[in-house]
Structures are given as structure tokens and as C-alpha cells.
């Protein structure tokens, strides 16, 4: 689908369709008023007859409106004007895209980007429109034999901005929005792929393909089990012992700043391509969704794609920690004591708390990069779902400025995160009689104790942990990966690169 931006008056548009907003109760937006004026009150007369109230999501498609050059006008309800916020704006865009796609409008000029959204500028409105459009049209049908497509799908969308002065920021918004949307799609595709296809080797192949596609700035190295053993990554290796699939750690290095003093931001993604729970096996119901336990790695991959596409002037390293947790004769057991790469020992009390055992060794491994910051992304705990539900990602950090940066980026991107505490009182729950640390700390504060566990391996750098167990995928009829937190991390890195979205 093609996107562009322009500045023009609605009466001069020759298009298959013009999209304008209507507020409750039957109040025309400024652009709709202009169209009403040139059509001699045609639109307002329809509203007076009760054809459209203006409630969020209501639509009315008009054909051959008098004196209007475009073939059709799509009126879309936006709710009460003063209550149009970020969430409602995106819902209106989503409804618009679905309506245009379902009614055979192959191209359209959208004036919704001129609506006033509280606290948001034109760059944000255009970028979110692009991201939302791509999200709305996403489908995962690679493995279906019968693929359904609209007969006349939407192919071209033009977003209007109020003045020519805003064209540059609008074009930049489209560029950024497309790159982020492509990163989200890549993450969703990886997450939705079945575990018999998407294993650690598949993740590694995707990482290598990324380096091939962006060879100017990207290098990928894949570290196998033998090299991990030599590095002392025994905790990581133990998790994969029960699987016939080799554990592989893919390291994607992007260099956008040639300065020798430029330290990288490191992103670490948990890549459990299937998590049965191991010997502490999970219930059968819903176990199919444990293919999504690699969504942290998928998100990191998507972000690295975005960074490479936009050629951001920063250095970023993404690590995909690929592994599979299966029961078997070689599987690790409750009661085992593992020696981590850091030298600390861990008593395994539950083999289904495996993500932290993989991540702790990777967090030690990345010390060699002397990072400016390290952010790990993991579907780590069911406790985080209980705490924050399916709408907000859990955030923990050992560095207040980094935590504040991430929270700010989450608000900018509409991909929200909420900070949870780390404290010595929680660390006490991880005490073990037989090792330096236990891999679980009981039910109370389970998301926090998982973060506390990881924090013991991050003392040499600024670190943040994103628990995406509640936000990485949806269950039920709309089952599928969400691509979160690609938008959050993309915004964080855009901010670091100097593109903070301010006009």
C-alpha cells in the first residue's frame, strides 16, 4: 500500500474517495463544512435527516455529491470533538481503512489527519495513521492454501496536512511509520509462525537474512551450543537440553555511528520458540500459545529491521536468545544447580521459570560490548499479566533516567509501559539453601522477583527489563502476535537518534 502527504483544499481533490470526520451530535468537522458549503448544504441535510449521528465508528458513504470532484465522500463518526484522544483517533483510522477496503475504494484522500487530537502534532497524527493502517490490513496467511483478498483492495492513501509548511514533517512521519510498521509486521510474522518451523535455527536464518539485506550497516553472528559451552553459558544451555533442536544465540550488530567512542544500545530478546514448561510441564489447555514465548526475540528482530531501514545514526546490537524448553531424558530438572556465565550458581525450583535462566547468561555475555544501555524483552511471567493485564507492559530498571526515557517513549508511541519496583525486600524471596540464588521466589510479586533475579546479572551497566507476557499476543478469536513492544523501542531509539517527533 502506498502512502503520501499533501496540502490541499477538499473541493479540488479528484480522487476515488475523500475521508472527513463528523462529531457528535451531527457536527461537521471544518473540512466537512467546506464540502457541505460547495455542495449547497447536501451533507448537512443528510445529517438533519438522521443519516449519521457522529458516534465513534459510524460511517456513511456518499456517491456523486453535487459540485464535488471526487467520486465519493466517506463520512466517519469521531465522537465528541473535545474527547478525541489518541486511542479514539486510532480507532477512527482503523474503521476508515476497513470501510475503504471493503467498499472497493482503491485510493483515497484522508483529511482525518487535520483533526485536533489532544496533545498531538501533525507528525504524530500522520505516523499513527500509517502504522494503524498497516496494522489493520495485516493478516498471517502464509500457511493457508485458500487466501481471501478483497476484489478491489485499498492501494493508495493520501494524508492531508493543513499547510505546506508541514509537508516535510508529514513525509518524515510516513517514512518513520512505514519502517516501524514493517518492524511490527516482521515481529508478528515470527511470532505467528508455528514452532515446528520457527525454532532457534529459523531465528538465526532470519537474523542472517537481515544482515544480507542491510549489509552496509549490519553484521550477524550466530553462536552455537559448543561455543556457548566454551563461554560458560551453562544456564542457557541447560534449558535446551530436553530439545532435539540446538540452542542458538543470534547477535545482530548495527553500526550507524562510526565514532570509536559511540557505545551501543543492546537489546536482548527471549527466544523460547516453544515452552512446554519442561519437567515442570504446563497444562495442556492453551499450550499451543507457548509458541509465542519467543516474542521478545521477535520484537528485537523487528526493531533491528526498523533501525537498519531508517539508517539511524546510532549503534544498536540485538541478541535473539533462541532455545526450546522440552521434557526429555536429557532435560534439566527441579533441584538441579546450574553455574551461570557470571559464576553465580542457581538452584532450579521450577523448570517453567526458564526464561530468566537463558537471559541471565545473555546479560552477562553482552558486557563485552561496553553498552550505553541494555534492555531485555521477554514474555517472562504470568504474574505480570495479573498485575497489568493485557494492555500495559511491565518495566523494571536499575537506572531511573533510562526508565523515564522508556516510559516517555511508550507514551509517545501509544505502546504503554508501567514501572514496577525493584527492592532488596524482594531479593530476599530468591534466597536458596543450596546455591547463590533460586530461580523462583514464590507467588507474591512474581513479576518483580523475576526482575530482581535478572538484576543480579546487570550490575556493570544501565539496564531495563520489559515483561511483555500480557502484551505480546492476543488469545481467543483474534489470536495472534501483536508486535509489541516494537513501537515503544522504536520510539526510544528514534529519540536517542534525535528524531523525537517535535515539529
From Swiss-Prot:
One of its GO terms (cellular component) is cytoplasm. PANTHER family: CYTOSOL AMINOPEPTIDASE (PTHR11963:SF23), LEUCINE AMINOPEPTIDASE-RELATED (PTHR11963). It is an enzyme of class 3 (hydrolase). It comes from Citrobacter koseri (strain ATCC BAA-895 / CDC 4225-83 / SGSC4696). Its main location: cytoplasm. Pfam families: Peptidase_M17 (PF00883), Peptidase_M17_N (PF02789). InterPro entries: Leucine_aapep/pepB (IPR011356), Macro_dom-like (IPR043472), Peptidase_M17_C (IPR000819), Peptidase_M17_leu_NH2_pept (IPR023042), Peptidase_M17_N (IPR008283). Binds 2 manganese ions per subunit. This is Probable cytosol aminopeptidase. Its EC number is 3.4.11.1, 3.4.11.10. Its cofactor is Mn(2+). The keyword Manganese applies. Mn(2+) 2 binds at residues 270, 275, 293, 354. It catalyses: Release of an N-terminal amino acid, Xaa-|-Yaa-, in which Xaa is preferably Leu, but may be other amino acids including Pro although not Arg or Lys, and Yaa may be Pro. Amino acid amides and methyl esters are also readily hydrolyzed, but rates on arylamides are exceedingly low; Release of an N-terminal amino acid, preferentially leucine, but not glutamic or aspartic acids. SUPFAM superfamilies: Macro domain-like (SSF52949), Zn-dependent exopeptidases (SSF53187). Gene3D superfamilies: Leucine Aminopeptidase, subunit E, domain 1, Zn peptidases. It is found in: Cytoplasm. Keywords: Aminopeptidase, Cytoplasm, Hydrolase, Manganese, Metal-binding, Protease. The gene is pepA. Belongs to the peptidase M17 family. NCBIfam families: PRK00913.1-1, PRK00913.1-2, PRK00913.1-4. PROSITE patterns: CYTOSOL_AP (PS00631). Mn(2+) 1 binds at residues 275, 352, 354. Presumably involved in the processing and regular turnover of intracellular proteins. Catalyzes the removal of unsubstituted N-terminal amino acids from various peptides. The active site is at residues 282, 356. One of its GO terms (biological process) is proteolysis.
Amino acid at each position: 500500500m502506498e502512502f503520501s502527504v499533501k496540502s490541499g483544499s477538499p473541493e479540488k481533490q479528484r480522487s476515488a474517495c475523500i475521508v472527513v470526520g463528523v462529531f457528535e451530535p451531527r457536527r461537521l468537522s471544518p473540512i466537512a463544512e467546506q464540502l457541505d458549503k460547495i455542495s449547497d448544504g447536501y451533507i448537512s441535510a443528510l445529517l438533519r435527516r438522521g443519516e449519521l449521528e457522529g458516534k465513534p465508528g459510524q460511517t456513511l458513504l456518499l456517491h456523486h455529491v453535487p459540485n464535488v470532484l471526487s467520486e465519493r465522500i466517506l463520512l466517519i463518526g469521531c465522537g465528541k470533538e473535545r474527547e478525541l484522544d489518541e486511542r479514539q483517533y486510532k480507532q477512527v483510522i482503523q474503521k476508515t481503512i476497513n470501510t475503504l477496503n471493503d467498499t472497493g475504494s482503491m485510493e483515497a484522500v484522508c483529511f482525518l489527519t487535520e483533526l485536533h487530537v489532544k496533545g498531538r502534532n501533525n507528525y504524530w497524527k500522520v505516523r499513527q495513521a500509517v502504522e494503524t493502517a498497516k496494522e489493520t490490513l495485516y493478516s498471517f496467511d502464509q500457511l493457508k492454501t485458500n487466501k481471501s483478498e478483497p476484489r478491489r483492495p485499498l492501494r493508495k492513501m493520501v494524508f492531508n496536512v493543513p499547510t505546506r509548511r508541514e509537508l516535510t514533517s508529514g513525509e518524515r512521519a510516513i517514512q518513520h511509520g512505514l519502517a516501524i510498521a514493517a518492524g511490527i509486521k516482521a515481529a508478528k510474522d515470527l511470532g505467528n509462525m508455528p514452532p515446528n518451523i520457527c525454532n532457534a535455527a529459523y531465528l538465526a536464518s532470519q537474523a542472517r537474512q537481515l544482515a544480507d539485506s542491510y549489509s552496509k550497516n549490519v553484521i550477524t553472528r550466530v553462536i552455537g551450543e559448543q561455543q556457548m559451552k566454551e563461554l560458560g553459558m551453562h544456564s542457557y544451555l541447560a534449558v535446551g537440553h530436553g530439545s532435539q533442536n540446538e540452542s542458538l544465540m543470534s547477535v545482530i550488530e548495527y553500526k550507524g555511528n562510526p565514532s570509536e567512542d559511540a557505545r551501543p544500545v543492546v537489546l536482548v530478546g527471549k527466544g523460547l520458540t516453544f515452552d512446554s514448561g519442561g519437567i515442570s510441564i504446563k497444562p495442556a489447555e492453551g499450550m499451543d500459545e507457548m509458541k509465542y514465548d519467543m516474542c521478545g526475540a521477535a520484537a528485537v528482530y523487528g526493531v533491528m529491521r526498523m533501525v537498519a531501514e531508517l539508517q539511524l545514526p546510532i549503534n544498536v546490537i540485538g541478541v535473539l536468545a533462541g532455545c526450546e524448553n522440552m521434557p526429555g531424558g536429557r532435560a534439566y530438572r527441579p533441584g538441579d544447580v546450574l553455574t551461570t556465565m557470571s559464576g553465580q550458581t542457581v538452584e532450579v525450583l521450577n523448570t517453567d521459570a526458564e526464561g530468566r535462566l537463558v537471559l541471565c547468561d545473555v546479560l552477562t555475555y553482552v558486557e563485552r560490548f561496553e553498552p550505553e544501555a541494555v534492555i531485555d524483552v521477554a514474555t517472562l511471567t504470568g504474574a505480570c499479566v495479573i498485575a497489568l493485564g493485557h494492555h500495559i507492559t511491565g518495566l523494571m530498571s536499575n537506572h531511573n533516567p533510562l526508565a523515564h526515557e522508556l516510559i516517555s517513549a511508550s507514551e509517545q508511541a501509544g505502546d504503554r509501559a508501567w514501572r514496577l519496583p525493584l527492592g532488596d525486600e524482594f531479593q530476599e524471596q530468591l534466597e536458596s539453601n543450596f546455591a547463590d540464588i533460586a530461580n523462583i521466589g514464590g507467588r507474591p510479586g512474581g513479576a518483580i522477583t523475576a526482575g530482581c533475579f535478572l538484576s543480579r546479572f546487570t550490575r556493570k551497566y544501565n539496564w531495563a527489563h520489559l515483561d511483555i507476557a500480557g502484551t505480546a499476543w492476543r488469545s481467543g478469536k483474534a489470536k495472534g502476535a501483536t508486535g509489541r513492544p516494537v513501537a515503544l523501542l522504536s520510539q526510544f531509539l528514534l529519540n536517542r537518534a534525535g528524531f523525537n517527533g517535535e515539529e
